[in-house]
Amino acid sequence: MASTKEKLIAHVSKEQPAGPTNKVTVVGVGMVGMAAAVSILLKDLTDELALVDVMEDKLKGEAMDLQHGSLFLKTHKIVADKDYSVTANSKVVVVTAGARQQEGESRLNLVQRNVNIFKFIIPNIIKYSPNCILLVVSNPVDILTYVAWKLSGLPRNRVIGSGTNLDSARFRYLMGEKLGIHPSSCHGWVVGEHGDSSVPVWSGVNVAGVSLQALNPDLGTDKDKEDWKSVHKMVVDSAYEVIKLKGYTSWAIGMSVADLCESILKNMHKCHPVSTLVKGMHGVNEEVFLSVPCILGNNGLTDVVHMTLKPEEEKQLVKSAETLWGVQKELTL
């Protein structure tokens, strides 16, 4: 006897099974992972989303919750499992898993705890998606991007840290608040470490091509009567402030991740401040990952933009590198 489905549908041709073309995996279904997953779904970036976590009940619950919203999405397949085989053939793998940053804890304090987690995660990702682009979000992101690069064996263009993409977004938002202008019209870059020793490039801050430093030569210095330096201080303090108020950060970093995924999956050749290997650049001699302006496309990180930094900015960048290297060289990989 024919089933309801057979009575309803008349097959015209046999469907040829085809794999996903823009599959994205998110490893870790905590607050950041789910904010990233939702942001990716709402941007219609992927034809298949895979979620992975060791906490099976939470993983299943988050996946079901997203699947129940399928009517409102254009991603037709959302899958989840603690087994990494579910991630097979991913174009981009977003790694958010790791120990959560506690109130008042620096990102660098998190490091060895998360390195040990990465020793399990990264080989499993590569086993099932050897051609993927790794986007590392877990903190401390610059060191863990280096760790992912070492553990994965992937070329440097395919291991990217979310870096200061969010720091720069925070900077532009706060700059816009000070000027009464939308952040998209406020241009400024925060480079270096994602976190406490990040470097604001005051020499490049502009609106409509008008350099703010040309209008205010003391911009960003202690002599500045308008105290623009406090804008960067607020960028550095903002994560700690949000954690203090709500216990974690999630939405802004989730949107930042989706922004980076869009540039990769749509081959946009867009410039982002993301974490990459900077040895040999700007006086950095150590094998460290720091954020500099990079072009992102289908092959991952395709180019690095040569910034013109003032001596004091370059000095800060080198100091950032030395801070990270001091921690990195002690790691057990």
Swiss-Prot record:
GO terms for molecular function: L-lactate dehydrogenase activity. One of its GO terms (cellular component) is mitochondrion. GO terms for biological process: lactate metabolic process; pyruvate metabolic process; response to hypoxia. Its main location: cytoplasm. Gene3D superfamilies: Lactate dehydrogenase/glycoside hydrolase, family 4, C-terminal, NAD(P)-binding Rossmann-like Domain. Its EC number is 1.1.1.27. It holds the Pfam family Ldh_1_N. Keywords: Cytoplasm, NAD, Oxidoreductase. Pathway: Fermentation; pyruvate fermentation to lactate; (S)-lactate from pyruvate: step 1/1. SUPFAM superfamilies: LDH C-terminal domain-like, NAD(P)-binding Rossmann-fold domains. InterPro entries: L-lactate/malate_DH (IPR001557), L-lactate_DH (IPR011304), L-lactate_DH_AS (IPR018177), Lactate/malate_DH_C (IPR022383), Lactate/malate_DH_N (IPR001236), Lactate_DH/Glyco_Ohase_4_C (IPR015955), NAD(P)-bd_dom_sf (IPR036291). It catalyses: (S)-lactate + NAD(+) = pyruvate + NADH + H(+). CDD domains: LDH_1 (cd05293). The active site is at H194 (proton acceptor). NAD(+) binds at residues 30-58, 100, 139. It comes from the Eukaryota. It is found in: Cytoplasm. Coiled coil: none annotated. Interconverts simultaneously and stereospecifically pyruvate and lactate with concomitant interconversion of NADH and NAD(+). HAMAP family: Lactate_dehydrog. PANTHER family: L-2-HYDROXYCARBOXYLATE DEHYDROGENASE (NAD(P)(+)) (PTHR43128), L-LACTATE DEHYDROGENASE A CHAIN (PTHR43128:SF10). Belongs to the LDH/MDH superfamily. LDH family. Homotetramer. This is L-lactate dehydrogenase A chain. It comes from Danio rerio (Zebrafish). The gene is ldha.
